[in-house]
Regions:
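Conserved ATP-binding N-box helix of the HATPase_c
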Residues: 17-29, 35-36, 126-151, 176-185
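Hydrophobic coiled-coil of the DHp/HisKA dimerization-phosphotransfer domain
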Residues: 82, 86-87, 120-129
Length: 203
């Protein structure tokens, strides 16, 4: 039995909920940092003989934390919208990695992905957006849960563009069979290797 569009959407939204839950601490921390630094600036600025230079470092810190908030929120907003088809694989990887990478850092883990040039060579896939996002998100979630070092590598192929998610410690990246089956129904292949998982998308 193949997965319907509504079933794929439901699976993707469940994965997105897990992703957002992982990133929530980082987002709340950045928002709190902006608020605290603004309050410090206000408090110091009210004191007589305070120079602008004495509060500039707090303004810079608030700006850095606001950048984090904007980056996470923009990624989340894009992932809640229907993906444009054909689906840009690299764009979806980057959005998911922004949220999961923030969560990984708070757990003292590291997620790295290839640069934009590498992903541009992968290109787009005809697979449904929900299926593409589901496959990428589930594989990355499992990898980050089981490893402290995870690398996401772009694989360019004329017939089947894809990606390889590698565990730095050599841990197996085993995705739930129902996720593998749902992805396969959409033409996406998820294949586990001893210390990595490969995802291939239909052109």
């Amino acid at each position: 039995m193949t997965a319907s569009s509504s079933e794929l959407d439901a699976r993707w939204l469940a994965a997105l909920a897990r992703l957002v839950d992982r990133a929530a601490h980082e987002l709340k921390g950045a928002l709190n940092g902006v608020s605290v630094n603004q309050e410090v600036i206000r408090s110091r600025a009210e004191k007589p003989n305070t120079s602008a230079a004495s509060v500039s470092s707090f303004a810079a810190a608030a700006a850095d934390q606001l950048d984090v908030v904007i980056s996470l929120t923009e990624a989340l907003l894009a992932l809640t919208r229907r993906a444009r088809e054909p689906v840009d694989v690299g764009a979806e990887v980057r959005r998911i990695a922004i949220l999961l990478g923030a969560a990984a850092r708070s757990d003292e883990k590291r997620l790295t992905i290839d640069d934009a040039t590498a992903w541009s060579s992968v290109g787009a896939t005809s697979a449904p957006g929900s299926a593409v996002r589901l496959a990428i998100c589930e594989c990355l979630l499992v990898a980050v849960e089981r490893s402290t070092e995870v690398r996401c590598v772009a694989l360019a192929d004329e017939r089947a563009p894809g990606m390889r998610i590698e565990s730095g410690e050599g841990n197996a990246v085993m995705v739930e069979p129902e996720i593998v089956a749902a992805a396969a129904d959409a033409g996406i292949t998820i294949r586990a290797e001893p210390s990595a998982v490969l995802i291939s998308f239909p052109r």
